Regions:
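Short beta-strand/loop motif that positions the catalytic acidic residue
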Residues: 206-208
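C-terminal catalytic histidine-bearing segment of alpha/beta-hydrolase fold enzymes
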Residues: 227-272
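Cap/lid segment of the alpha/beta-hydrolase catalytic domain
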Residues: 76-77, 81-82, 104-131, 247-249
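Short amphipathic alpha-helix adjacent to the substrate-entry channel of hydrolases
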Residues: 83-101, 224
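N-terminal cap/lid segment of alpha/beta-hydrolase-fold proteins
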Residues: 5-63
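Alpha/beta-hydrolase active-site loop
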Residues: 115-148, 257-260
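Short beta-strand element of the alpha/beta-hydrolase
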Residues: 65-74
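Primarily recognizes the serine-hydrolase "nucleophile elbow" in alpha/beta-hydrolase
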Residues: 131-201
Length: 272
């Protein structure tokens, strides 16, 4: 008998002061008004991001591989779930020798009032802001340009995105602008509907749950496009997980996604 998942508690949002990240690297954007940080249950989020930054999580040099992963949180391009889909994943990777960098990319403007913001989050999500793509490309170029400083192989820089962040990752990996392709890519509960897969598409790891309320109904024809293009792809379709689970454990097999991603990276020789 299938075990039902426990219902998630209602989410409450409380404004909190912006934390200080001494090692954050600005990505050449201007901040005319302070971004807004929020406590969302046990995790933090941030909205109205207009000044992009890259926040490093570097491994212990004694166990560091030469691989880097840029982590792009989701949030519907109206906020970033920067703890559950950013810092926690980056720290997990750094603990296993992978240099990780959380990308705080620019978003669409949303109401500064909390109640109005919550109402706006219930509306149809906007499309990918051009600034988010600019920030992701800038992040890839920056990590490669400073690869020697961080003891990273500039040919082993991947991009891992959650939900909206996965849409950014997919666009960089598959879009017509190939000026800053990642060397490998992970789409964590991003859309997997069909789109062209170019001949230079990077190896891709993809995750989706059958009960994802946003993207499961769209299917995963993109995986077939990878196969038709003879490009490497690994796809995990979980029975349960929903959407936006990130690093949160739910007692389902989707809890294992990051272990499986790590195993995939290792199997491709990226941790040698």
């Amino acid at each position: 008998m299938q075990q039902a998942q426990e219902p998630r508690p209602a989410l409450t949002i409380k404004e909190i002061p912006a934390p200080d990240f001494p090692g954050a690297i600005p990505l050449d954007s201007v901040d005319p008004e302070p971004e807004q940080w929020m406590a969302m249950g046990r995790d933090r989020g941030v909205r109205n991001v207009v000044s992009a930054a890259l926040i490093p999580f570097l491994p212990d040099p004694a166990k560091a591989a030469s691989t880097a992963v840029i982590v792009a949180p989701g949030g519907g391009f109206r906020m970033l779930a920067i703890d559950n889909e950013g810092f926690k994943a980056a720290q997990w990777l750094a603990d296993r020798g992978i240099a990780a960098f959380v990308l705080k990319y620019r978003l669409h403007s949303v109401p500064r009032d909390t109640d109005a913001f919550m109402a706006a989050m219930m509306s149809t999500p906007p499309g990918i802001p051009a600034t988010a793509l600019q920030d992701a490309r800038a992040a890839l170029r920056l990590v490669r340009s400073r690869a020697a400083d961080w003891k990273i192989d500039p040919a082993k820089v991947g991009l891992l995105g959650f939900s909206a962040g996965a849409m950014v990752a997919l666009e960089l990996a598959l879009g017509e602008d190939n000026s800053a392709r990642p060397d490998f890519m992970a789409s964590i509960y991003g859309p997997l509907s069909a789109r062209p897969v170019p001949a230079d598409a990077p190896p891709t790891f993809a995750v989706l749950a059958a009960d994802d309320p946003f993207f499961a109904a769209g299917g995963f024809d993109l995986i077939a496009r990878y196969r038709e293009a003879s490009r490497p792809v690994e796809f995990h379709f979980y029975e349960q997980g929903g959407h936006a689970f990130g690093m949160r454990k739910q007692g389902s097999t989707s809890d294992l996604w990051i272990d499986q991603f790590h195993a995939w990276v290792k199997s491709r020789g990226l941790l040698d």
